């Protein structure tokens, strides 16, 4: 910090903002072990599953794929009232920062320092969404290619033949 002081008119406030930015960048680049992430996701799911608006709740992303380390925790929920579900998610205990809160998505940072993302989908989309948000990106691309060759379209909303939905439930 002291090296920057006075250099090109950089003052204390600017230095403080630069340090905050570097800290945030380092935090966002950190990955945590699955051994640390699993108890966290288990605790969050235990807390949220008592919400009567939630029909199903599962971990997704790299945690569900059992990767050795995860960059964030992804949770998928099925329920009809997305806004209310997201509101209960961002207000749960242990949240230190709300990063986003919308009708179908919420993102928070929790006291363990990890980012947790929640996505709410309809019950009839849950299976397709769980597959899609579990990934990996490469797997999803490969799956879409196989589906295309069979005259199907696969997305987070379901499996379609033309405009007709032919799958998506879990």
Go through each PLM region and give its residues.
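Helical scaffold of the NTase/Pol beta-like nucleotidyltransferase catalytic core
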Residues: 1-58
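Flexible glycine-/small-residue-rich
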Residues: 20-22, 77-79, 120-122
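Active-site nucleotide-donor binding segment shared across nucleotidyl transfer reactions
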Residues: 42-83
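Acidic, metal-coordinating catalytic segment for phosphate/diphosphate chemistry
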Residues: 83, 87-170
């Amino acid at each position: 910090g002291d090296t920057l002081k006075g250099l090109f008119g950089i003052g204390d406030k600017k230095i403080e903002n630069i340090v905050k930015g570097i800290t945030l960048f380092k935090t966002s680049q950190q990955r945590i072990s699955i051994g640390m992430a699993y108890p966290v996701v288990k605790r969050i799911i235990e807390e949220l599953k008592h919400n009567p608006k939630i029909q199903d709740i599962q971990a997704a992303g790299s945690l569900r794929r059992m990767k050795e380390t995860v960059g964030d925790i992804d949770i998928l929920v099925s329920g009809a009232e997305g806004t209310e579900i997201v509101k209960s998610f961002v207000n749960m205990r242990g949240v230190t920062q709300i990063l986003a809160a919308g009708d179908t998505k919420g993102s928070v940072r929790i006291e363990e320092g990890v980012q947790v993302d929640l996505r709410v989908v309809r019950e009839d989309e849950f299976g397709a969404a769980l597959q899609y948000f579990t990934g990996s990106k490469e797997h999803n691309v490969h799956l879409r290619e196989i589906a295309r060759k069979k005259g199907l379209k696969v997305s987070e909303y379901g499996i379609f033949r033309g405009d007709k939905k032919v799958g998506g439930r879990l």
